[in-house]
Amino acid sequence: MANTQLDHLHYTTEFTRNDLLIICKKFNLMLMDEDIISLLAIFIKMCLWLWKQFLKRGSKCSETSELLEKVKLQLAFTAYKYVDICFPEQMAYSRYIRWYIH
């Protein structure tokens, strides 16, 4: 699943506003305002920290670029759905969005 726009995400667990916009563009997601972007960033950073702790504890998983990309994109998807569920009044328009993550 090569995508040069996402290559720089392989090597860091820090997400910037631009990283989130790239991910949302990849999945045709729309973000409404800065508050939602900030919430996504906090949620994703928390999940990635937990994932790093899991790997450090001697998991047999290898920390490859492909694995990290898959995990990060799945977390972005999860975070977006989380916001959709918790803030339906802000995200009601997202009901028509199709999801492409397998």
From Swiss-Prot:
The chain crosses the membrane at residues 36-55. It comes from the Eukaryota. Keywords: Membrane, Transmembrane, Transmembrane helix. It is a single-pass membrane protein. One of its GO terms (cellular component) is membrane. Its main location: membrane. It is found in: Membrane. This is Putative uncharacterized protein C6orf50. It comes from Homo sapiens (Human). The lineage of its organism: Eukaryota, Metazoa, Chordata, Craniata, Vertebrata. The gene is C6orf50.
